[in-house]
Structures are given as structure tokens and as C-alpha cells.
């Protein structure tokens, strides 16, 4: 059976790539732009299965076609990104890029990012090749389908294979569903894994088999509404599927179902007018190039503009993405795929040489033999600011005492490392210590009622970071409230999370290196540095604080927001450095010793605690 061109598939590809690009550009028409990847996966499962089993492709022919389709554009994008990264990425981010290069050459970048990062974390803005995880995922599916193809070649086996795919699809779908419901806190990075996505590929494969059944194909052609219903399902999913940490989950089935319905509705031209327009078909044809180039372009834009892009800058980035993608499609992707550039032997020789070159680059970069241009600034800044102790955790002493019999208001902070920061800041200020006794217990010991300090306290403060901690459920705070109020009858206070900044390293150090700030220029740059800290705030922290505030209102307890003494929203700054040039954070959100002293003073000056009644 010949694989006839279906323009509505290109229209569907266009919707997929546009939603992904808008999502990465943080153009918030909708919250579920990441579902574009799910649409791509279903399309890929359908197209590859159709090519393999119903077009008499040989295995070698299939492999050559896929390599010609994927690798010329991919390798060019990787080389270009590496060149720009050399000039603009910070040393630590450039070193991480080396690992990405090696992982891409083995088509396992999805596994690398599974271990390295959370897809929803802001640290992804320092990884210009993060989007290649889905290309590795697709190549892994190619390997899977190639093995199946080698085993099931004749018509009889195709019938067996059809039911085999259905069985595997159902098993994987229900397995992922059960896992998501029962173990969702352990599901954070499954987004990257083939095991969590294979059922989506297989649904596309099942459609390819189903459309080979003439009666079903003819019946579906009569259902004019079927295609439009699938498109409606996808559009609805863009608004109702949000960004949970444990995606893919049950909601993934919505866009997958919509994509399946559209593909199933076959080549009924009367029902495809929405996807058959020339604009969407054009975007669909260059969708692979758009996907390849958009992410590194936006990463570098975010990098240049302190992770805070204006709408106009986003438009510029979109235009650059389009024109580079168009050039890449016309002069790289299409000529190589149509065999207009290089015959088989020459083509594979070129691919192997570039592969080896990128692999060597990855080894040199990840081992820091080849260092970024900013490395020289890195060395200079380290020498100019020897007392900053970049990347070193400060030594502290917080005495784990029991409360005394004094008349001071007694405050117990139940917290994690950020709760420790709060206690250290409070204890570092003499005026606060004259009025309050402040002690610390781990959140776990308070929650499990193993702390002996609750009974002797006047106030119990819950101070944990929520996201990224093992106490990542808001319900745990409500559980602690019930313990404190019901069993001990103490006053309970919820403390908001500490501002976190978009970096996996020292943010002040990043600023000094990127701008090559000398020791003499530091004081003059303090306002710019503090604005830089505000520009690099993680967006999700505000949402977490809003949720904590609502919980405090429902429980009728006090809510204290750390933003009140760390940041100022009116003038758009967060303290990252004080007026004497002392650094206040040693990583993405933890105080230095100087920071604890500084914030202790701010807590006192703003009367942040406001606890006057014993």
C-alpha cells in the first residue's frame, strides 16, 4: 500500500510545534503547550509503522531514510549551538553542555536529562540542548520498531502484531495510570523516558494497522464530524492540561486521544478544511527544523536578557527562529532527505565524521580540557573576590537548646535547611533575641511528634520549601497544624517559601563573570545586581506562596512571607548583595553568614514577626 500524502497531518504537526514553541517562549495563551510533544509522538508512531509494514521498505532503506531525515539538521543545530555556547555560556553550563553532546551522539539525551534535571525546573534555561530528549526518544522507538519489523514481516505475522501492539498499549497505559495514581511523588522525571511514552507511540502504530482495514477506513471517511471533534479535544487539552510535576499522567490521554481521532478520520478532504490551510501546511512541513532551532535560540535570548524577555524580544526570537528554520529546511533538511546532496556512501561518511567530531568535542568540554571563553573571566573573578567563597556552604553554629524559663516569647521553627536559615537570621539579631527565644526542630520531628520543644513553645512556625523537599505536600502543613492546635493548643504560623533564583550555581558569581565586573566597579553595580536577582526569580515560587496564603486563611492562622524582607516588588529588586558588597546567598536560595545577619536586621526593621502577644 502506498503511503499517500495527507496534508492534514502536516497541519497537525504545525499545531504541535507551535504549541511547544509558544510554551517555551512563555507566551501564555494557554498552559498546556507542552502537549505538542504528545501530538508529535502519536504522529510518529503512525507514520513509521505505515512506512515499515505497508510500503515494502527494507530495513536498510528505512534506516537510511530516518538518518537522512533526522541527522543533518540535528548535527548542524548541535554544532551551531556549541559554537554560541563557547562564547556566551558560563563555565559550569558549558561543561554540562559537553555531557549533552555525548548523550546526543548515543541518542540517550533523555536519560541524561532524567538524571540531571526536572523538566519544569528553571535550571532548564541553562541547557540549550534539552529539547533533544524527544529526538532521542524517537530514535529509541525506531530501534524498537526495527526489531519488531525484523521479527514480523509477512502478512500473517502482521495480524498477530496488530493484537500484540494493542495488548502492549493497554498494559503500558494502565501501568502508567496505576503508577501515577499511587506513586506520583516519584514520577517527577518520567517525562523524559521511553517507558512512560511508548504507549503513545503504539497508539499511532495501532491506527496505522486499523486504517489498513478497508471497511473501517471507508466507514471513517463518512464521519465528517469525527476530525473536527479530535481537533476540539486537542484545543480543550491546551487549556485544561496544566504543568504538573508528574507529567505524563492521566491527563496525557486527552491530547493523545485528540491526535488519534484526527489521524483515524482518514483522508476525508471535506472534514479537514481547518488543518488543510496553506499556513498550517507550510509550518507543518518545516516543523522539524522549527523544533530543532527554537529552543537554543530562546535559551540564548533568555541568557542575554537576564531570563526576563519582553514581548517584543520574544517576537524577535520567533522571527529569527522562523527564518533560520526555513533556511535549514530548504538547504539542509530537504536536500539531504531527497538525496540531492551526496549519495549513500559519501553521506554516511560525512555523518560519521561529524558524529566523531561532536563526540570528541563532548569529551573535551565535559572534562574541561576545552573551556568556554568566559572561563578567563571566571578565574579573574575568583582572584578578585577571594573572600566570597563561591559555591562553599558557610559554617554555622546554631545551638540545639531547649527553651528556658524566661518571659520571652518562645518560637519553635519546624523546618528544613531554609527553616535553619530563618532561625540563624533571627538568632543573629540582638534586638530580636532580647524579645524572643527561637529554637529549631526538623519538620519531620515536629510532624512525627518526636520534638520535645512543641509543648514549651508559644508559637510554632512551619518553614519548609515545599518543592524539591520530601515534604512536598501541602497536606503535611495542615497535618502539623492539627497536631499543634489539637494536642498542644499552641499558636501556629505558616511561613512562605524562600525566594529561589534561576540558576544551578552561584547567581552573583554568574553576574560578575558575564559582565566582567572588577572589584573597583562592584559597589557601583549593586543596584543592577539586585535587579538581576529579581529578574532571575523562579516563577513558581509566587504560586506556591499564594497556595500557602490560602491555606493560612482557611486555617485562620498567620502567614509570614519572606519576600517582605528579601524583595521589593515596587522597584523590582531582591537583595543579593548588601551596600558593603557582601554576598547574601551562597547558592540558589540559602543565606551566607553575612546574608543571615543582613536578613536578621531586615526582619527586625520591618517588624516582620509582629508577635506581641504571649
Over which residues does each language-model region extend?
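Extracellular/periplasmic envelope-modification machinery, especially enzymes
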Residues: 218, 243, 305-315, 319-326, ...
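Membrane-interface helix/loop caps of multi-pass membrane proteins
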Residues: 1-342, 355-360, 613
